[in-house]
Amino acid sequence: MIEGAKWRRWVFFYLPMAFFLIFLLFPFYWMIITSFRPDGELYRPWNSANYNPFWTWKPTLDHFRYLFEETLFSAWLWNTMLIALASTVISLVCGVFAGYALSRLNFPFAGSLGTGIFITYLVPQTLLFIPLAEIIRNYKLGDTPWSLILTYPTFLIPFCTWLMMGYFKAVPKELEECARIDGASRWQAMLYIIIPVAIPGILSAGIFAFTLSWNEFIYALVFLSSPEQKTVPVGVTSELIRGDVFFWGALMAGALLGSIPVAIAYSFFVEHYVSGLTGSVKG
């Protein structure tokens, strides 16, 4: 009986899990291997001795050196970090206060307003593209980081608000009522009682907003035209793909370096991220 249970566990759990892990992680493995391959193995593998498509025996840092010496990759990294952090902070501040108001304050049409905010999040970004481009042009913000810092919250705030609404609803109202009885104002109760309890939800919303801002491509491609103002997704694809010529090594190196900040954010806050999403669903 025990042997049968072990067999079923291997067949129905471990083998499918191993398959999905390989399926999900193989692109990252291929990206890492390609970024360290010399050009000879990338473009003329038939001339390379002991060529292995899944491994390289002569790793090189030339592609990373090319990124930092021959392109503006350092500027792209700085621009992406600045835009992602600024838009995330703006979206979190607005989302936390809006989520608290819609979930904890009793006023007419609060539920309908919350539903409307979530529907706004579902609106495709392409529908907002033309009016946002007109606003950016009228205020002369084109080709500046502000063009993205002020437009990204249009799709980040609705999600942050919806997530925080669910999390605030899961926080017992008795905590806030006890603080009010002890003489705290609503502002003090929210700031010192509710928000500290909702930290996992805030971190979840922040990680999600940061990831979307970091990886966003369409707005960054259109609103930023100068090479020194571009973000990593736009700079890597526009400068390292020239017609039908692909600089595969530098492309993969740029993708690898560009994915590190997001991977670090998830690895450090994954527990808070999962608990935050769980709390928002329960709410």
Name what the model sees in each region.
Residues 2-283:
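A structural signal for multi-pass alpha-helical bundles of membrane permease subunits
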